[in-house]
């Protein structure tokens, strides 16, 4: 006779996506009827995000080092096509934002405010910051979550250990597996964490402050939805020659939803790693491409930079030609790739892009202030697009290289997981 599963067993073996949806709905209900109670449970969200941020650096370090150290000479990692997809997707996102902003121009009511941050003086400063992050102290890189530095040191250690004894390589492999199990445990608490995040955010900010920027938000979110559901599928189809939507929807569901509420690409790295494992992608590939994508794959950031820059341009009545618009797309794409090297991320790169049109810095910083006001939606959607695209492009490159039937593979994996969940229940 099969023993009746306990409540904890049902929680651990249940559908994570369904539990997250329940957490979202419960958070909305609690914040609507009892804001005070909602604020009191917001610590669950902060605790969850902190746990993800804590485990992400060490996860990336040991996985990358282990993958490279144990890599066979004939192994193909497919990193080059993935990086090309990252850059292509970011450039397409910026170009799409230019076109949408041209057909649906946005004007802003600027308000004077004091932003306690200093934007970079130019693209060279952004690149300079990234270069210094590469040679950061390894301990400081782990403590501060500097994933560029972590990748550099992990790769260096991995290459150095390729000549080590097999026992040393096996020990490193065992450590990476142990950290991965810890990550799986943390991710199982995503429903509770997202419940706290939703309840706390709605209770604290509400959406009243966003009503004055509905057109701006519509343009921003419209661009991001267009990239997620039209442009990315076209790119994936061009790479795999298979139906891209099973992969697209699964990544949006299992990566994008979590990223939307954590609002942190770094915190979502463990979630993406777990999803890549479910998709049965090559571990040597995704252990490097996912943390790299969290650093340079910034389609959402390029959209934010472009849309808000052109909103400032339209507000001031500045005319621009197609050549300047193309240049803005390139600058926004390059700047977005360096957004992780700037405190404040994509918003503080807006003055850099505004400089192309001669927009005064005072006006540019007022646009940045508006960005912070709408950040509860803008930043969430931006992170969801950025993070889910990391898995999408990694999977597309892997499927193309191995000539796997992408759509059939995703559907088969989902069917097997459903049967496994049903059997456990």
Swiss-Prot record:
Which reaction is recorded as catalysed by this protein?
A: L-serine(in) + Na(+)(in) = L-serine(out) + Na(+)(out); L-threonine(in) + Na(+)(in) = L-threonine(out) + Na(+)(out)
Keyword Transmembrane recorded:
yes
Its membrane topology: Multi-pass membrane protein
Compartment(s) where it occurs, according to its Swiss-Prot or TrEMBL record: Cell inner membrane
**InterPro entries (UniProt xref):** Na-dicarboxylate_symporter (IPR001991), Na:dicarbo_symporter_sf (IPR036458), Ser_Thr_transp_SstT (IPR023025)
Sorted alphabetically, the Gene Ontology cellular component annotations on this record are: plasma membrane
Biological processes per GO annotation: serine transport; threonine transport
What is an example of a GO molecular function annotated in this UniProt entry? neutral L-amino acid:sodium symporter activity
Q: Where are the transmembrane segments?
A: 11-31, 43-63, 91-111, 141-161, 182-202, 216-236, 290-310, 316-336, 363-383
| Keywords from the UniProt entry | Amino-acid transport, Cell inner membrane, Cell membrane, Membrane, Symport, Transmembrane, Transmembrane helix, Transport
Matching Gene3D superfamilies: Sodium:dicarboxylate symporter
The text of the family note is: Belongs to the dicarboxylate/amino acid:cation symporter (DAACS) (TC 2.A.23) family.
Query: What is this protein for, i.e. what is its function?
Result: Involved in the import of serine and threonine into the cell, with the concomitant import of sodium (symport system).
What is the name attached to this protein's record?
Answer: Serine/threonine transporter SstT
Gene for this protein?
sstT
